[in-house]
Regions:
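Long, non-catalytic architectural segments outside compact domain cores
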Residues: 1-65
Length: 65
């Protein structure tokens, strides 16, 4: 997957997390469940970014030598 697709996925994941947080503000009875789901989407975004940059670092390391 190219960098543009990765960043688009991250943007989508963070948008979904934001929607969960916004919904949590208006649904006190479900707040903790919604915030947990938001946290999971944020973790997914972070994981995708980490994997992307780790792959770039692995690719760039032999070029630098």
């Amino acid at each position: 997957m190219n960098g543009h697709a990765i960043f688009e996925n991250v943007r989508r994941y963070r948008s979904i997390a934001s929607l969960y947080r916004q919904t949590a503000a208006f649904r006190p009875g479900q707040r903790w469940s919604l915030l947990e789901q938001a946290s999971e989407w944020e973790a997914r975004a972070l994981s995708e970014l980490e994997a992307y940059f780790a792959a770039r670092a692995d690719y760039a390391a032999p070029l630098a030598a």
